[in-house]
């Protein structure tokens, strides 16, 4: 039994579902908080509470969203490893346009998550220092989003295909392959991480010198850097790349210890972006089986920046004076609709990808092992499956909205009961005459 369960996709699917459920759960909590935020009175304590709750829910969702493509890369690599035809069916066959829909939804998730962080800076005193970076971050995200959703082949008439010289556009076709798409999504992850770092340090003042930081913090930072180098080795990076990235990590650590932590973080971002872009371009000149392995090199570089960059940020801003307290409840109301968008996109995306995972088997119970001879052994068309998934998503959201409404009624009834008890409570103590 264990030999049958422990197959190529067992662990990748488990990890992918685990991370996706974290992101999905966080987005639903954030959507509930958004509903309560909009239903509360302005400048009320309740609105401040649900603003905080929405931020926490969105934070959990983003923490799941950022590593989710990494788990997807692993799952895709194992699918190709099990059977290359299965991978071709997934990315270049009948399901290829489904991944264009996936790109649109995930792009909306990244853009929405970043937009929410940028709007959240309006409630943070001192965050106006970093708002000048927002147009550049938005530009990077938009370009990467456009690259990611560009299809490799276009639906075109015979006349249009003749004008293009084939089914592939001479320019846009270059951006339709996985080398470009892997590069784009990794740059989007780095950009989202940078937005979060700017948000996190929004109300932080001057940095505390490293000489005043605890020895334990410095040792922990050094250990995390060393573990990052080990991670690069474990993930199968070639020795020359491990050596280069290890040197950059050590230099970033030295800069952090020399009170230049932000420079060290910038160096890490530059290193990771260079690795991602280099292997994205190099992927055009190698075979597909080699190109698939490049995604791991790109992912490991980004993952190292996420881990070490976060550690440096925590240490260098530890104990820093605050410019002011966060004004919970002062975020613009349009930010709450972003939280609704995130919850809807996550739900729809999970349904569509479930169709892709199940439909990949086509007319097999186990691909190329046990054939399905039943009358229902067919794969629904993308349009039919998308319609069914959309109806299911709508029903799910209506059920969740009904639960939200019931919870709101219960809370409201409890509050009214408490108010009546306060009014009816007898006044104790002596009178003025006494």
Segments from the language model and where they lie:
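Polytopic transmembrane helical bundles with strong interfacial aromatic enrichment
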Residues: 1-434
